């Protein structure tokens, strides 16, 4: 539900101009979905969701041809469904989290609000996105431009060197309980299922 709600902004208010720019809808929406989860369930839950997204991204990176791991795709002469994989979602949201981590949430949120105000009700291309972020967030700061690695995130395959894997300890109790059950150290009824949710 959170994902589809977030499409009110990224997908409806500002939408991708072509299927090559699909990540602009899904990467932003996945990022917003995580922010909604953080607001409702707290930081630890949001990071747990980020870890699951990151792990899925790692799996996808291993299975796709390198060109299909770029955010901005080249689907010329191809079925647009060829670009419908988790790269747009998970790499796109990881890219936005990287920008947030580098510039800080307050500054990033101010840029996000402005981005949607400036571009409301118009189709967006990746080039237009990059122009906007350079004009309204980077603002000519060469050191920040280098640190963000915008072009590497968008146009290069795989992940740039500034990608940071999220880390969560929240999975340990679940893994410990599952392992204890597996090795026969307790009945399934002893596992605290009531505290878990999906």
Where are these regions (language model features)?
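Non-catalytic terminal regions of proteins
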Residues: 176-198
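Hydrophobic alpha-helical and helix-loop surface patches within well-folded domains
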Residues: 1-178
